[in-house]
Amino acid sequence: QAREALRGKWPMAAVAALIYSAIAGGLSAIPVIGGLCSLFVGLPVAYGFTIVMLGVCRGKDIDFGVLFEGFQDYGRIFVTMLLQAVYTILWSLLLVIPGIIKSYSYAMTSFILKDEPEMKNNAAIEKSMAMMEGNKMKLFMLDLSFIGWAILCIFTLGIGLLFLQPYVAISRAAFYEDLKAQQGGSVEVNVEVNVEI
């Protein structure tokens, strides 16, 4: 499903990943204030990249302007993304495994923020937790299916990540779409992922 959505859009998707990675990497490299810049600018851009790929999953063309959509509703997006990060870190302080589990519980938050503009902060995070109840392992296995490609990307000096990153993001968007479609009934997920590039 993700590969089909990317048909004819691979180059543009790679450019979107490059822009996102350049912003994230560039901000973190700024001396002294890099951490703060990554926080206040990086979180909305990370949201924007996720939403760009959600659009591709829904058959839309890639619009680089959407990368910066998080700044149009900055307070809601930033605070929610920050809370998500803080909660994950706090759980990770207890043990690594609880932190990983919680990160999967919160994985649908960005999509929910996009589709439900009236929802914010803990409400969006809690809805993600409800959607992921019983589905965290499925998403983990989906992510795990890309490990081989991630290892191969090491031998391309990271260039392959420009193609893998959108593929993973769109696969997660497809996972969300399937979950959302089943909200009225079973929460079983049936997302077929082919990691052949």
Where are these regions (language model features)?
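Hydrophobic alpha-helical membrane segments
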Residues: 1-197
